[in-house]
Amino acid sequence: MREFVVVGRPNSGKTLFTLNFAAYMGSKTVDVISRSYDNLVSCRHFSITEAKNQLCGMTLHKTPFVQSLVLKIPLGKIDVNFKITDTCGIGEHIHPNETIRRGMAQTLSFLRSADYIFHILDVSGITTEHLEKQTSIDFDIYNYGIVHNRYTLLANKIDLPSTKEKIPKLAYLFPKANTIPVSALLSQGFKEVKLCVAHNL
Amino acid sequence: MSYIEPQNIILAIEKGDIPPSQALRYFQEMDFKIRTNSQVNHSQKRTEDILHELDHLIGLSDVKKIVREIYAFIEIQHRREKEHLHTEPLVLHMIFKGNPGTGKTTVARILSKFFREIGILSRGHLIEVERADLVGEYIGHTAQKTREQVKKASGGILFIDEAYSLARGGEKDFGKEAIDLLVKAMEDHKNEFILILAGYQKEMEGFLETNPGLNSRFPIHIDFPDYSTQELLTIAQQMLTARQYSISIDTTATLLTLLAAHQNTVHENFGNARTVRNIIEKAIRRQAVRLMAKGSTTKEELLFIEGVDFVEVK
């Protein structure tokens, strides 16, 4: 089964994207398989609304370790299963909390082994510093993904008015990336993401 | 600090020794090294395997020498390009001259694989055509057929056997049109395919003399000399070994006499390695008939071709 890993900074909307994308693909309920950093696997069954209430939030590092969903996509006359894995957000600096550091290490481990990378970028977080120094972790993820040729940038939070003027700058910041503007909250741009999944299965 | 294994990087993040951004850069370097090394090693190994396959062919020392020269030339052109020096254009259209069964098609097949490995050809396939595949029957038909073959050969080698037959029909024949189209295609698509014209020595020389424009467009001319009797014997032994058969010393002498007789008596139509293959296959069938008469056979009997099996082979 092909595995698509969703990575990005903390609070960029990875979990909300994963759950709303599952809903867009026709799932009413989801089995969330979590794998802790010591390889303890647990499975929880949720409705999409319950999952969003429990797993998403405004606090940083709400997702401390990877959690996967198995979804179906119709290809021709058959349905093909694929795995989408939501990860712990990664930042530029060494985190003081060991649990979070382990979560980040697990994210990078999955990033290396995944078949495809969906990099969620919080467009509202693009600042002048980004434009000048390009020091954000997002550039490191981008550089890693581009080299591996199995990467798509999902420019998230396009529903916010402040992001409108920033979208055109993405072509300058991430020139080689295949970019899809999305709103994880409003499920916008998911048709293109679905096409991307179908294309890379 | 340098990290050798990806697991060490993961541990370093967990311990708080390096930030995730640094880890990603380490991973990138690590993956790049692994990929580059494996690509270079695989490509080099495949190129060596192909050259080994060529070296394994009996005789053809001139052919082997020219292929090595081409390899060295291409390699040096690449190195010059890296140093921003002037490079010679790589025109690799060839003429193969030799009697039937001297290995022209076999060498062309090996060359197609070789050129793909060293990056000259994108697909490295061989399209083998003759007059009938290129020359049409009515006006406009030849252009259509020739263009189709050139298109098919894109990324590979277009091998025209008995190429002189294109000029066989004289001025009014459509063969001349095919030649003109091929010359144009060689110029227009020079980086996309390699054209090899093959045929008997004498006829090819006559063909090139009557079409002086052609000669200058083929920088590489390779002669395929007839095999000596000893070389033919080695080829026969190779063929027998490949089919899990064997011959005794006495039978070897019989086979040698048979090959020499073939070379002396029917020289004009002698098919060299192809004739050897036919002789071997006939002998194998004769052996089968001989053994069928016996009720039971030993492993040794099944393995050995006797002198008597070669006697009746013509």
Residue ranges and their predicted role:
Chain A
Residues 1-92:
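Conserved G1/Walker A P-loop phosphate-binding module
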Residues 68-72, 105-110:
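Conserved alpha-helical scaffold flanking the Walker A/P-loop in AAA+ ATPase domains
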Residues 79-83, 115-116, 150-151:
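Loop/turn-to-beta-strand initiation segments
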Residues 84, 120, 154:
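Generic enzyme active-site microenvironment
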Residues 89-97, 111-135, 158-163:
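Conserved Switch II/interswitch segment of TRAFAC-class P-loop GTPases
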Residues 100-104, 137-138, 166:
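Amphipathic coiled-coil/heptad-repeat helices and related helical stalk/stem segments
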Residues 142-148, 174:
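Short, conserved loop/helix-junction motifs that constitute active-site signature segments
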Residues 152, 157-201:
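Canonical P-loop GTPase G-domain recognition
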